[in-house]
């Protein structure tokens, strides 16, 4: 009898929840006829919750681990897109994700009247599951009254499932999804320009084709643009593992910068920016540069500021070019810490670049240097001499744009927007540091912080053999300085702290010696024990302690 009563209770409870679900679904469907935008915006999220199996692979952003028996097949599939395709295909297209926002972000209230947005996603031979998961995350986690359309720009994909199959599939989605086909492989930059030209939203939001938007991602971006239409905003970019598709929250304590080679890099948010925000981490972070894959911009302002440089090829450098242009021409660039979007970070690209990756990036970087970096372009050319050899085309239109917009000089950008830049404003020399005795050069060997500086045959190609002897008497290689903490070394590379101490060196232009002030020893040739690293020895004036600093008059 008790079992019978228990069964009736369970059945009644289950039936009640089914009826509640049906009622809510019908109720919110009817809200299409009402005026309350916020209620209507809940419909896609509600449907997703009702239909989802919360225990499936990858739910709540959990890692998907492939059994040992399938490892070989997994590795083969990995090569197609340079991420774990097998894991991705096991995960639901509308999988659940954790709410990774700061607690203060969860209670923020945004204005009712926000600008709407077109979401532009460029893809080339993208995997079905990652592309559709990107689209579903946009639709399911965006209020539909703010979502004008999703524009998919196909950059000449060759895979059949990305043609008619995709077109038929997106017809049934709840938000208008438009597919634009590029006639030939054109690259991210020109494909985005095509998508932007076709957009109708007041704001354009660019996303990569392997992203996942989280709860509340869109409103903070649009609210900031509503406050200032000349503000270009980026979400915090969370990490989706290319191996397991685990969703990992990104840090709100990093912002965008660049190194000597004009490679985008993440750096800790400086104290001055924390002070400006009065310690409130839910406020946007002013960032010198953006990663470039994910951002929102007022559509009219995008046109006014000069869209993208259409003379650049494929991708690479366009993010820094746009970052410099926005700041130098009166706009601002921010990371909105209450917005989170995940991105699959790959260790390698599965695509080829016409002419080779190096050629494309060198051309793009040369264009941005010629237009935006003023005299600092010469610093970059010493670091990367190969850039000077490429044909970078005509930049007269971009220079005219800069003149018409009355943009500020690059020195202003470094002093006011990016004072933490790794580019030394004053230096005595820039280039190789060559040992007179061995005719070898100091070389950072591509090593990281807290590793020994090396010495190697001089190659004259810049890169790892470019060091700057700064006006602060540091020996710098990018953001690392040569540091000696005890007698007889070793000489290691540490973050430059600008406090002199272990990083203070005196160069004697007559004796050609580099004396470490704290230890009162001189930089010397390698020992027999390790011929790949320089040593520290008592100063003797020998040829092995003599060093020639390239371009010694430059920057004095």
From Swiss-Prot:
Disulfide bridge map: 105-338, 329-407, 441-458, 481-496, 522-539
Region entry Catalytic subdomain B, spans: 284-346
EC category: transferase
UniProt keywords, alphabetically: Disulfide bond, Glycoprotein, Glycosyltransferase, Golgi apparatus, Lectin, Manganese, Membrane, Metal-binding, Signal-anchor, Transferase, Transmembrane, Transmembrane helix
Residues spanning the membrane: 5-27
GO molecular function: carbohydrate binding; metal ion binding; polypeptide N-acetylgalactosaminyltransferase activity
Topological relation to the membrane, as annotated: Single-pass type II membrane protein
Residues annotated as binding substrate: 155, 185, 315, 346, 351
Regions of this protein lying in the Lumenal compartment: 28-556
Domain spans labelled Ricin B-type lectin: 428-550
Region (Catalytic subdomain A): 114-224
InterPro entries (alphabetical): GalNAc-T, Glyco_trans_2-like, Nucleotide-diphossugar_trans, Ricin_B-like_lectins, Ricin_B_lectin
CDD domains: beta-trefoil_Ricin_GALNT13, pp-GalNAc-T
Associated pathway: Protein modification; protein glycosylation
Tissue specificity: Specifically expressed in neuronal cells. Expressed in fetal brain, whole adult brain, cerebral cortex and cerebellum. Not expressed in other tissues tested.
Topological domain spans for side Cytoplasmic: 1-4
Chief localization: Golgi
Family recorded in the similarity comment: Belongs to the glycosyltransferase 2 family. GalNAc-T subfamily.
Designated name of the protein: Polypeptide N-acetylgalactosaminyltransferase 13
Lineage, uppermost ranks: Eukaryota, Metazoa, Chordata, Craniata, Vertebrata
């Amino acid at each position: 009898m008790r079992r019978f009563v228990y069964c009736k209770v369970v059945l009644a409870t289950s039936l009640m929840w089914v009826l509640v679900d049906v009622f809510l679904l019908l109720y919110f469907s009817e809200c299409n006829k009402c005026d309350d935008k916020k209620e209507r915006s809940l419909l896609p999220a509600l449907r997703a919750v009702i239909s989802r199996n919360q225990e499936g692979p990858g739910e709540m952003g959990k890692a998907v681990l492939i059994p040992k028996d399938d490892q070989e097949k997994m590795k083969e599939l990995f090569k197609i897109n340079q991420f774990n395709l097998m894991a991705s295909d096991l995960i639901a297209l509308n999988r659940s994700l954790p709410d990774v926002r700061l607690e203060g972000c969860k209670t923020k209230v945004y204005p009712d009247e926000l600008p709407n947005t077109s979401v532009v996603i460029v893809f080339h031979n993208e995997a079905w599951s990652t592309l559709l998961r990107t689209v579903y995350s946009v639709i399911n986690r965006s209020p539909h009254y703010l979502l004008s359309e999703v524009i998919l720009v196909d950059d000449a994909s060759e895979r059949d499932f990305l043609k008619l199959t995709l077109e038929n599939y997106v017809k049934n989605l709840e938000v208008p999804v438009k597919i634009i086909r590029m006639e030939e492989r054109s690259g991210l930059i020109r494909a985005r320009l095509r998508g932007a030209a076709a957009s109708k939203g007041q704001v354009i939001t660019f996303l990569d084709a392997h992203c996942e938007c989280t709860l509340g991602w869109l409103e903070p971006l649009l609210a900031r643009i509503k406050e200032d239409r000349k503000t270009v905003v980026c979400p915090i970019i969370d990490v989706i593992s290319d191996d397991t598709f685990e969703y990992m929250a990104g840090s709100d304590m990093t912002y965008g910068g660049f190194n000597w080679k004009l490679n985008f890099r993440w750096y800790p948010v400086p104290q001055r920016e924390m002070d400006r925000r009065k310690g409130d981490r839910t406020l946007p972070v002013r960032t010198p540069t953006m990663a470039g894959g994910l951002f929102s911009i007022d559509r009219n302002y995008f046109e006014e500021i000069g869209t993208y440089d259409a003379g650049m090829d494929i991708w690479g450098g366009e993010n820094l070019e746009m970052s410099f242009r926005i700041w130098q021409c009166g706009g601002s660039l921010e990371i909105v810490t209450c917005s989170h979007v995940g991105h699959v970070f790959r260790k390698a690209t599965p695509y080829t670049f016409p002419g080779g990756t190096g050629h494309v990036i060198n051309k793009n970087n040369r264009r941005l240097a010629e237009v935006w970096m003023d005299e600092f372009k010469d610093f970059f050319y010493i670091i990367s001499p190969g850039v000077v050899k490429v044909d970078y085309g005509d930049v007269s239109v971009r220079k005219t744009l800069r003149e018409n917009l009355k943009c500020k000089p690059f020195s202003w950008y470094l002093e006011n927007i990016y004072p933490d830049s790794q580019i030394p404003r004053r230096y005595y020399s820039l280039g190789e540091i060559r040992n007179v005795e061995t005719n070898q050069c100091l070389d950072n060997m591509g090593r990281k912080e807290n590793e020994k500086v090396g010495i190697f045959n001089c190659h004259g190609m810049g890169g790892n053999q470019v060091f700057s002897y700064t006006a602060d008497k540091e020996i710098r290689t990018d953001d690392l300085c040569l540091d000696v903490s005890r007698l007889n070394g070793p000489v290691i590379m540490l973050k430059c702290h600008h406090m002199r101490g272990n990083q203070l060196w005196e160069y004697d232009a007559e004796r050609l010696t580099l004396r470490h002030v704290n230890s009162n020893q001189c930089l010397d040739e390698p020992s027999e024990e390790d011929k790949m690293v320089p040593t520290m020895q008592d100063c003797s004036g020998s040829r092995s302690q003599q060093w020639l600093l390239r371009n010694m008059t430059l920057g004095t």
